[in-house]
Amino acid sequence: MGDVMIQSVKTESGLVDGHHGSCDSLGCVVGALAKVAKLVVALAALVLNGALCVLSLVALCVGATPVGPLAVLVATTLASFLCVAYVLFIAAKDRGWIASTNKC
């Protein structure tokens, strides 16, 4: 069977009753895997972004790196930041990772 998740059902009295139901839908599994993949990509981009920021600051402080490679580092850092922003905010229809996961 599929994963068990809590579903809310509105009763005749207007109260919301929560109960456990199974989610066997392939769409739910694929949707959950897609959200996890987006999160992994975003976290990898954040790590890359942080590493490139540190490298560019070290190169700037030491003065051992010419301006050209430093500009490439800054541009790559900016591109990484934009990728994270796209994955986390623009590409996500629900504007969040935990919003309404029980659409089975």
From Swiss-Prot:
Specify the protein's topology with respect to the membrane: Multi-pass membrane protein
**Keyword terms:** Host membrane, Membrane, Secreted, Transmembrane, Transmembrane helix, Virulence
Q: What induces it?
A: Cotranscribed with incD, incE and incG within 2 hours after internalization.
**Could you list the residue ranges that cross the membrane?**
39-59, 70-90
State the signal peptide span: none
Keyword Membrane found: yes
UniProt KW rRNA processing keyword: no
What does this chain do? Inclusion membrane protein probably involved in early modification events of the chlamydial inclusion.
| Protein name, per record | Inclusion membrane protein F
Q: Which organism is it from?
A: Chlamydia trachomatis serovar L2 (strain ATCC VR-902B / DSM 19102 / 434/Bu)
Question: Gene name on record?
Answer: incF
